[in-house]
């Protein structure tokens, strides 16, 4: 019984950590894109054209 509960807790913890990491990564990317757009609109356009 305790082993089962422990496995569930471990799985929940891993899921929570993974979700948190993904959430932070998305926020970080959005913030960085927003900063780039505000500061350097011309270079961002050049980068898009080059790609």
Curated annotation (Swiss-Prot):
The keyword Transmembrane helix applies. GO terms for cellular component: host cell plasma membrane; membrane; virion component. It is found in: Virion; Host cell membrane. The keyword Transmembrane applies. The chain crosses the membrane at residues 11-28. Keywords: Host cell membrane, Host membrane, Membrane, Transmembrane, Transmembrane helix, Virion. It comes from the Viruses. Interacts with GP2b and GP4. Belongs to the arteriviridae ORF5a protein family. Minor virion component that plays an essential role in virus infectivity. This is Structural protein ORF5a. It comes from Porcine reproductive and respiratory syndrome virus (strain VR-2332). The lineage of its organism: Viruses, Riboviria, Orthornavirae, Pisuviricota, Pisoniviricetes.
């Amino acid at each position: 019984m305790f082993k089962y509960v422990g496995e569930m807790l471990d799985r929940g913890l891993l899921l929570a950590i993974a979700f948190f990491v993904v959430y932070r990564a998305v926020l970080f990317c959005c913030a960085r894109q927003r900063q780039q757009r505000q500061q350097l609109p011309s270079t961002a356009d050049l980068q898009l054209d080059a790609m």
